[in-house]
Swiss-Prot record:
GO terms for biological process: defense response to bacterium; sperm individualization. CDD domains: UEV_AKTIP. Belongs to the ubiquitin-conjugating enzyme family. FTS subfamily. InterPro entries: Ub_conjugating_enzyme, UBQ-conjugat_E2_core, UBQ-conjugating_enzyme/RWD. It comes from Drosophila sechellia (Fruit fly). This is Protein crossbronx.
């Protein structure tokens, strides 16, 4: 009997912890929405709130016109864990802060450790935006041997023409694969489709006319006024399903 009570208490504690974590992750998502970061789009996986899908659009500088997909992996105890979230690009991206082997972005120069309540995912994404906007400035004051891609750093500082050529190769590759079949069946994976007049034409016309389908009454009534896109959030409410 005692063992059963202990097991129930343990299950209840785990459920409470999960609910609290999901609220915190949802708050992070809402903060990102409110920041309106230009050229960066992210959304949590439909099945796992600790995995996020993202796309970075270069708007200026050496990486202008780039379209780089990436994944964010959150630590199991996020955001209470001091471990840093991991950003991994899905393709080769030449940059002093991106590992050429794992394609992971080194954020430790800006975030030595994760401080719960002080550090937020929107800041992490803002950092990504800044270092791609000015890669040379992003490595000032950092020893070359402490960078993830030493070769990229040396090219950037000593042979910018070659660095730019390598970047352009990355950009070309990213565009060639933008319409590829998704590597996952997760419905929240960000998918791009080629323009189809019969499908996208009416939407484009509404945008040009200053109207959006999302503002039409019928669209709002169909989903309660909100479309979260998150399976672990109750439809029509910002409430994790775990609470039920």
């Amino acid at each position: 009997m005692t063992l059963d009570l202990d097991a129930h208490k343990k299950d209840d504690k785990l459920l409470i912890t999960t609910i609290q974590q999901e609220y915190k992750i949802l708050a992070e998502y809402k903060m990102i929405e409110s920041e309106k970061l230009s050229g960066i789009y992210v959304i949590p996986s439909y099945a796992n709130s600790l995995q996020w899908f993202g796309v970075f659009f270069g708007r200026q500088g050496l990486y202008a016109e780039s379209v780089f997909r990436f994944t964010i992996l959150l630590p199991d105890r996020f955001p209470d864990d001091k471990s840093l979230p991991t950003i991994i690009f899905q393709q080769d991206v030449i940059h002093p802060h991106v590992c050429p082997y794992t394609h992971s972005l080194d954020v430790s120069h800006a975030f030595p450790e994760w401080r719960c309540g002080e550090d937020h995912l929107w800041q992490l994404l803002k950092y990504l935006q800044v270092i791609f906007s000015d890669p040379l400035d992003s490595i000032r004051g950092i020893e070359v041997d402490k960078l993830k891609n030493r070769e990229a750093a040396e090219l950037l500082m000593n042979n910018k023409e070659e660095y730019v050529a390598r970047v352009q190769e990355n950009i070309k590759e990213s565009k060639e694969h933008i319409f590829d079949t998704p590597p996952t069946e997760d419905p929240n994976y960000i998918v791009f489709e080629k323009f189809q007049q019969d499908v996208h034409g009416p939407v484009l016309d509404r945008i040009k006319a200053g109207r959006s389908k999302q503002t039409e009454p019928s669209a709002q009534q169909g989903n309660g006024g909100h479309a979260t896109g998150l399976s672990w959030v109750k439809e029509g409410e910002f409430k994790p399903l775990s609470i039920e």
